Amino acid sequence: MYAINYKTLIVQALGFEPTADQQHAIDTFAEFLADRDDHVAMLLRGSAGTGKTTLSGAIVRTMLALKQRVVLLAPTGRAAKVFALNSGVPASTIHRRIYRQQSLGGSFSLAPNMMTDTLFLVDESSMIANEGLRESVFGTGCLLDDLVQFVYSGRNCRLVLIGDKAQLPPVGEEESPALSSAFISGYGLTVYESDLREVLRQSQQSGILYNATVIRQMIAHDEATALPKIRFSGFPDIVCVPGDELIETLATSYSQVGMDETMVVTRSNKRANIYNQGIRNQVLWREEELTSGDWLMVVKNSYYWTEQKKAEDTSAPAFIANGDRAVIQRVRNRRDLYGFHFVDLWLQFPDYDNYELQVTALTDTLATEAPALTREQSQQLFDEVMADYADVRTKPERYKRLKADPFYNALQIKYAYAVTCHKAQGGQWAHVYVDQGYMTDEMLTPDYIHWLYTAFTRATEKLFLVNWPKTQTEE
């Protein structure tokens, strides 16, 4: 098919006259598809309000109408769910698509790409890390390397990376490598790229997108010498919430849009903990440490519990990922062992079609400031459980017993009413509350600007800025 036909069909699928930036992206995409060389990739970068999501959906619908195979991927379960909703096609996480388990309790190797003539579209690509993760059980530990290797090992398969450079880069990295044409061309690929900068007219009436655009321009021009001033007047979708009104306002959000569509975003685990305790005690009136209906976030990858279920349910996911959210259905059998606290939970995972799983969880991580068990705590748990198998003669057999021990493999969890921005990234909620904590001009860093932009753009309907200072408010 000629490139011109692709262009016409994508514009038709879009349903309105594209902006100049969108038209350029459509032209570039058509050239990318028409290139006869297999070693080509495309980067579609765009910030909030520029129509990147709408254009991605139109591209997917056009490809399907032409009977072209497409695979939709995203870095997290929540991001995959959002991508699927926006495009009308199922999406999965990158990890679940490109890795397969080598052995029970073992590592995951790169799966063979059995697809042919397939377009792989990856949303929220700013989150894809490529720093080798120590002790990673996935492939090489470099996710971007593995993704590229996987896609191009399939016959006539191509990759489109979609994302927003203004968002926070992966932890430990200066920029998002998956959105860098220099980085992607380093794989021996010819890179087609397009940037959406023009904010759509309907987006200009949104306070969330107006202010996000102002913040993004500070990033683009690298000119942040003072904290950004936020415009509230004339925008019903962005409001300032004084601390003494927070409990009542949060309760209203829960009743209006539900817990699944409400999120508090903070700058640290410490602040998130304070919010989680306060929300449970003063908004939800929960006294028990855990109760049915509680929202949790998994804070460390876990393979053990899904393995147990795979014996009876082959459709069970290969693992539960760090950042996955779950709702408690039942709580049973609290017990103290090895100097830690454990409980049996029946969980439902809303981002995975309400998949249900029974686990033993570790409650010590619920209120700690560390992201998960500390190195010292992990070592203590290892030593204590290992001592239970002291009578087992050989070291390999002791390790085998340890790997099969439910307490050693207990799920590490935190409450999920308030999270850090890195944990919220990739997700969107109708109502988002942002607490930046105490800030001064002297504390201003590029990282803070990326943080603020990412936090603002998690909200789809209403943004609540908690205790927002007058010095950061546009008069």
List each language-model region with its residue ranges.
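C-terminal accessory regions
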Residues: 337-475
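Short coil/loop residues immediately preceding or within conserved phosphate-binding loops
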Residues: 39, 323, 416
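Short, solvent-exposed amphipathic alpha-helical segments in soluble enzyme
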Residues: 88, 279-283, 449-453
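Conserved helicase motor core of P-loop NTPases
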Residues: 6, 25-29, 37, 152-157, ...
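Conserved pre-motif I regulatory segment
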Residues: 2-40
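ASCE P-loop NTPase helicase motor core
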Residues: 27, 31, 36, 40-224
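Short, conserved phosphate/pyrophosphate- and ester-handling motifs at nucleotide-, phospho-/glycolipid
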Residues: 22, 76, 268, 426
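Conserved SAM-binding loop
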Residues: 18, 72, 264
